[in-house]
Curated annotation (Swiss-Prot):
This is ATP synthase subunit a. The chain crosses the membrane at residues 29-49, 87-107, 116-136, 146-166, 183-205, 219-239. The keyword Transport applies. It holds the Pfam family ATP-synt_A. The lineage of its organism: Bacteria, Pseudomonadati, Pseudomonadota, Alphaproteobacteria, Hyphomicrobiales. It is found in: Cell inner membrane. InterPro entries: ATP_synth_F0_asu (IPR000568), ATP_synth_F0_asu_AS (IPR023011), ATP_synth_F0_asu_bact/mt (IPR045083), F0_ATP_A_sf (IPR035908). Gene3D superfamilies: ATP synthase, F0 complex, subunit A (1.20.120.220). It is a multi-pass membrane protein.
Amino acid sequence: MTSHAPDPVHQFEISRLINISVGNMDLSFTNVSFFIIATVVATSVFLFISSSSRGLVPTRMQSISEIAYEFVASTLRESCGVQGMQFFPLVFSLFTFILVANFIGLFPYFYTITSQIMITFSLAMLVILTVVGYGFRKHGIGFLKLFVPSGVPVVILPLVTMIEVISFFSRPISLSLRLFANMLAGHITLKVFSGFIVSMIELGIMGVGGSILPLIMTVAITALEFLVAFLQAYVFTVLTCMYLNDAVHPGH
């Protein structure tokens, strides 16, 4: 029996579900669109159900939502102070959206929207545009002090300022690439190991014995991917709070 090895990249392909075009614009409803909506709906339903509980003893869902709430609130307060709480809806929405999207992508035949650079870059740009918009609205031209560190000798000030500007505008790139690359690499690794298991089993009795180690590795990597799914949402949230601090307190 001959079989073709599964393509580990095929799972990231964007496919049209409903063809929609307006003039020369392709506005088709794709699998990415579907899972974006599914992520928003799943997150909203979970938060609605968990916040509807009125019992004296919190349910498991209520405890999870309270932990998420306290994590975002405490991270914002530590990074930006009390003023940072005005960004709570944004940061909490980003955290829950990324976390749920990452978890949904771990289920077989489900799509991982955070493995698409266009999704992660859009989320990162939302953060940076919020920082720039709020910074100029709150501080005016004083927001530019962010790029002029205090205590720097005048001789090297232009060089340091240029480095600060480059560093600032590279933030959406690093923020989006970190999430995208981790989710992409993890799912490719899982696909490779699972494909190897299927190929070994197709060889018969001898292949079944040889598939035990890859199976153990697949289970271990799957468990690790659940941890990575949380850690990536955690890191994105912490960095978002740090960047928002620059908008609240632009002076070094």
